[in-house]
Amino acid sequence: MKTISANSQTVKRDWYIIDAEGKTLGRMAAEIAHRLRGKHKPEYTPHVDTGDYIVVINAEKVRVTGNKAKDKMYHHHTGYIGGLKSISFEKLIQKAPERTIETAVKGMLPKGPLGRAMFKKLKVYAGESHPHTAQQPQALNV
């Protein structure tokens, strides 16, 4: 019996939809990262992108536990001297709710070209509507 190694031509990718309303950010992000990598499939291969497409709706209604809404800070640098910017979870969820989920998932994926390819399969939307109805995504309970 030969060992089967997946390649990009043999991988079958499914579409899943997750409703983030009332879900805890970290627990949901861990499951999304797991599925984007393809670790739930028997043909998982570490050096091949075997993951599925994930559509997340209601990103504005995701929750965090404890005082993280006020205390959790997101940092980025503008590239200019003294350009370190910080924003709290509370303000970021009002300004760009998609970024909270995207940042959490991106930190859980591999760093490098393969991780960037996996991240492109994540689609996050603030509200109920999304443009991926033609792909007929299956509901996924996290």
From Swiss-Prot:
| Signal peptide coordinates | none
HAMAP family (UniProt xref):
Ribosomal_uL13
Could you give a single Gene Ontology term from the biological process aspect? translation
Subunit structure of this entry?
Part of the 50S ribosomal subunit.
Superkingdom of this protein's organism: Bacteria
> What is the similarity comment for this entry?
Belongs to the universal ribosomal protein uL13 family.
| Gene Ontology cellular component terms for the protein in this record | cytosolic large ribosomal subunit
Q: What does this protein do?
A: This protein is one of the early assembly proteins of the 50S ribosomal subunit, although it is not seen to bind rRNA by itself. It is important during the early stages of 50S assembly.
- Matches recorded under CDD domains: Ribosomal_L13
Among NCBIfam families, the record links this protein to: rplM_bact
Q: Report a single Gene Ontology molecular function.
A: mRNA binding
Query: Any idea what this protein is called?
Result: Large ribosomal subunit protein uL13
